[in-house]
Swiss-Prot record:
Complex and partners: Homodimer.
EC assignment: 1.2.1.70
One GO MF term attached to the UniProt entry: NADP binding
Family according to the record: Belongs to the glutamyl-tRNA reductase family.
List of residues binding substrate: T45, C46, N47, R48, S99, E104, E105, Q106, Q110
Species of the source: Caldicellulosiruptor saccharolyticus (strain ATCC 43494 / DSM 8903 / Tp8T 6331)
UniProt-listed Gene3D superfamilies: Glutamyl-tRNA reductase, N-terminal domain, NAD(P)-binding Rossmann-like Domain
Additional detail: During catalysis, the active site Cys acts as a nucleophile attacking the alpha-carbonyl group of tRNA-bound glutamate with the formation of a thioester intermediate between enzyme and glutamate, and the concomitant release of tRNA(Glu). The thioester intermediate is finally reduced by direct hydride transfer from NADPH, to form the product GSA.
Lineage, top ranks: Bacteria, Bacillati, Bacillota, Bacillota incertae sedis, Caldicellulosiruptorales
Record-given protein name: Glutamyl-tRNA reductase
Sites annotated Important for activity: H89
Length: 394
């Protein structure tokens, strides 16, 4: 059974942040959830926390909440999709249908990262890995055909528009991960005067400091906040990193808190000259090309349907994997047995003949597999598989 349990941007950020997982915590939970299901992948972003499962039996949601130390009172806020609905949901997510910024592209990298982390930490996930790979393949074709690059949208472009309208030219960025990099990449060609970088130095951010030395510079948090007109927060910390004491008395400051959990302490929201805009409010500012993107995406929805059918067909055909393995194993044994009858040949020649026989046998088996695949599509897979058993195994 294939299914997903999740919570997304339709639930307010104050509640959503309770279920957000840091990278370290995510890795820990992947291991613990493997006790409940054969395969697990966790997708955790600022807009959603989703857990994808593949197992022979459905896992009770209460057991999942217990394993994750989540408050069961919030269970009604979570959605659950099974089998085809689960496949459809992931494909819509990676294609941008389920994003607050409709059609945004950052989700593609996040889906890929979720797949990779699960592989590194949780071991083999053959079905879920295939699901995520097909979803990413679908997204690539969908975005190309829908020509979404002609109407790009990112958090950086939405925030940048606000800064331009407010004539803000000095910005501080706290959190130099993927979101921080996205903003640096956006600001390098903008007309802002200064970008103060707060956080651990890394190679990706270093390039901006080296190529644009007058615009980008690393800075201490308090010094940067004192100089800046705007603070952009996007760390992955499990707690607040900007506090009331970090803001000079009476300072006018615009803060974009893009982190989940929040980077900005609640006391900062109460400061009279400080305006804090959270991630959900930023997403609501996207209006310029939203309708155009929605129209283009709906026109190309058939691409998603095509890939859904492709994956369902693959998943259904998977029931024959043990038969295929057994047929190939049996054929190899027969080939090796026949080689024993060869006389007047040395060991090297015997090995070459054995390899040739196995290769020829596999050619016939591969053709039988193709016939089985066609029969499966037509609904007669069981009849065909029984014939293959009679021909190759009896």
């Amino acid at each position: 059974m294939l299914w997903v349990i999740g919570i997304n941007h339709k639930v307010e950020v104050d509640i959503r942040q309770k279920f957000s997982l840091t990278k370290t915590k995510l890795q820990e939970k992947l291991i613990s959830l493997k006790k409940l299901a054969d395969e697990v992948i966790i997708l955790s972003t600022c807009n959603r926390t989703e857990i994808y499962f593949f197992s022979e039996e459905y896992v009770d949601i209460e057991k999942i909440f217990t394993e994750l130390d989540w408050d069961r009172r919030y269970m009604p806020l979570f959605y659950i999709y099974k089998d085809k609905d689960c496949i459809k949901h992931l494909f819509e997510v990676v294609c941008g249908f389920d994003s607050l910024l409709i059609g945004e592209e950052q989700i593609v990298a996040q889906v890929k990262e979720a797949k990779d982390i699960a592989k590194q930490v949780g071991g083999k996930n053959p079905v879920l890995e295939r699901l995520f790979e097909v979803a990413l393949k679908c997204s690539k074709e969908f975005r190309t055909k829908a020509r979404l690059n002609e109407h790009p949208i990112t958090i950086a472009s939405v925030v940048g528009k606000v800064l331009k309208e407010s004539n803000i030219r000095k910005i501080a960025i706290i959190g130099l991960g993927n979101i921080g990099f996205l903003f640096c990449n956006y600001f390098k060609n903008s007309d802002v005067d200064k970008v103060f970088l707060i956080g651990r130095k890394n190679e990706r951010i270093d390039q901006f400091v080296k190529l644009y030395p007058g615009k980008f510079e690393y800075s201490d948090k308090k010094d940067a906040i004192s100089e800046a007109q705007c603070l952009i927060c996007s760390t992955s910390a499990p707690h607040a990193v900007v506090h009331k004491d970090d803001i000079p008395d009476g300072k006018n400051l615009l803060i974009f808190d893009l982190a989940v959990p929040r980077d900005v302490d609640v006391e900062v929201y109460k400061l009279p000259n400080v305006k804090v805009i959270d991630i959900d409010q930023v997403h609501k500012m996207d209006a310029t090309s939203r309708e155009i993107r929605i129209s283009k995406m709906q026109e190309n929805y058939n691409i998603i349907e095509k890939y859904i059918d492709e994956f369902i067909e693959w998943l259904g055909f998977r029931q024959y994997r043990n038969l295929i393995i057994e047929v190939k194993r049996h054929a190899e044994q027969l080939c090796k047995a026949q080689v024993k009858y060869l006389k007047n040949v040395d060991s090297r020649e015997r090995e070459e003949v054995e390899r040739l026989l196995i290769r020829m046998a596999n050619l016939y088996i591969d053709r039988a597999i193709e016939v089985l695949r066609e029969a499966h599509k037509e609904g007669s897979g069981e009849i065909c598989s029984n014939l293959i058993k009679r021909i190759f195994l009896k």
